[in-house]
Amino acid sequence: FLVFCIRGNSSMKIIDLSFNVEPNLSEPMSIKIKTRPHSGGSKFGRKIVFMGKRSLKDKAMAVIHYMSGKERITKKSFPDQEFINEQRISLSVHTGTHLDAPSHFGTRCEGKRPKTIDEIPLEWCYGNGVVLNFCNKGPCEEISVEDVKKELERIEYCLQENDIVLIRTDTDKKWGKPNYFYEAPGMSREATKFLVESGVKIIGIDCYSLDKPFMAMVKQY
């Protein structure tokens, strides 16, 4: 998830900027969420009887005891006839609010094996943030290095080492609709390079991806 903290004189406000993980029209890859309700706990409890590594003899005895009712778990076995609730979720790593690891982009990064998501230091994921506003950009338009420099000049800010830059385009207002995926601006190569060379450690954006939509990139290519 993504949070933004606003520090006041004596307190800090934490704002959750992340999207919910849920099936919707903005996600090009399917999300499946299967929920086992509390009322279905007895079915889960039934599986527990046969779980674990057992000898064939023990398994046979477990079946006999279950069929005879000696080890049978039903709704009545639980207080209020309820058991634990659980969810099984199937999704892409490129779902909702997420962090792309260097390994997402290729097999080499700066001449080395790129870091996978579990190798990303947590220190990379928090720090001082600055919001750059490009809400004036339309679908498939490019955010140039000149745009970035002008915005920094407008807010009177000089990028610092290890800053986290959040790119605002207001594309997130389309979340839940199909056009969220294909109607968004994107960072140019030069603009991204400028941020990286300025010492920025994380770049966030409210679009599906940091680049322009796939269809626009393919057409340009």
Predicted regions and their residues:
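Active-/binding-site microenvironments in catalytic and ligand-binding cores
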Residues: 5-221
